[in-house]
């Protein structure tokens, strides 16, 4: 083999390396998809109430201020583990009451404090939103966020 890389050798290394890394990327993409569909998320827990809660989350643009499992804005707290932080992850009725009470009692007009808007949700919407947040607490995030405070 010669000491100098020829144009043909360089081309072959480029194409071979490109194909190799495209195959690796494809395999990792498939692996991530399979993991997300089979292990990370328990779809058996996706009740109509959880799905409706997700729609309420999207309709009210909660992600514009909050993060959910690290995705979203960092203006307000992470909500992926909020039910665990509040100590109501295993009690749906307490989760509903806690979420409703907290959202309805938001203090207003405090100077220098970030303010969450009042959404005027119905009890059914509060229940669905709390079910959605309870469901997000069951997702295997591999210990993300790294602290309990979100």
From Swiss-Prot:
It holds the Pfam family Cytochrom_C. This is Nitric oxide reductase subunit C. The chain crosses the membrane at residues 13-29. Component of the anaerobic respiratory chain that transforms nitrate to dinitrogen (denitrification). GO terms for molecular function: electron transfer activity; heme binding; metal ion binding; nitric oxide reductase activity. Keywords: Cell membrane, Electron transport, Heme, Iron, Membrane, Metal-binding, Respiratory chain, Signal-anchor, Transmembrane, Transmembrane helix, Transport. Gene3D superfamilies: Cytochrome c-like domain. Heterodimer of cytochromes b (large subunit) and c (small subunit). InterPro entries: Cyt_c-like_dom, Cyt_c-like_dom_sf. It is found in: Cell membrane. The keyword Acetylation does not apply. Heme c binds at residues 62, 65-66. GO terms for cellular component: plasma membrane. It is a single-pass membrane protein. It comes from Paracoccus denitrificans.
